[in-house]
């Protein structure tokens, strides 16, 4: 049900690719965090390492600066509910270091909202939005070439708004 602006249903793809690109040490020229924290992105990862896309205004963009081809292979596992990206290319000796995201400015989710819905049978309760606390996260990434020269030195800051749970309550 969430409608705010940024997003559009393919963000699992963009978030997973963003993480692969970070770990490959490639320059990222455009990335946008979600408007609010998405819990399932934080199940195996700290908050703040996500990317949203929404055509035509919000995109994830990166540059292949290796001087060689890169093959991007995706694999979806329905059994494990997992999406994996593997980037193949000629190694150029770059090294990548990233700090663990720091969470600041934590704010709890607002109180849940319950809305009457005459289209649902009386007594039925349907959750259409899920609570998420607000926060600001930041992490740092450094990429060095094979000689130790810094190629990329950047901070990523994500600001997430607190989000309330919304329940429809049947009155029909």
Where do the model's predicted regions map?
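Well-ordered beta-sheet/strand-loop patches within structured domains
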Residues: 1-172
């Amino acid at each position: 049900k969430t409608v705010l602006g940024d997003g559009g249903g393919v963000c699992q793809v963009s978030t997973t690719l963003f993480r692969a690109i970070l770990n490959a040490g490639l320059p990222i020229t455009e990335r946008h965090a979600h408007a609010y924290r998405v819990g399932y992105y934080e199940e195996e990862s700290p908050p703040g390492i996500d990317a949203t896309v929404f055509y035509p205004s919000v995109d994830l963009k990166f540059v292949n600066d290796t001087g060689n081809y890169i093959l991007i292979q995706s694999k979806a596992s329905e059994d494990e509910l997992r999406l994996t990206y593997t980037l193949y290319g000629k190694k150029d000796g770059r090294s990548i270091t990233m700090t663990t995201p720091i969470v600041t400015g934590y704010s709890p989710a607002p109180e849940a909202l319950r809305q009457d819905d005459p289209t649902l049978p009386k007594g039925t309760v349907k959750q259409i939005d899920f609570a998420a606390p607000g926060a600001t996260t930041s992490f740092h990434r450094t990429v060095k070439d094979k000689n130790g020269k810094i190629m990329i030195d950047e901070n990523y800051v994500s600001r997430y708004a607190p989000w309330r749970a919304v329940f429809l309550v049947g009155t029909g």
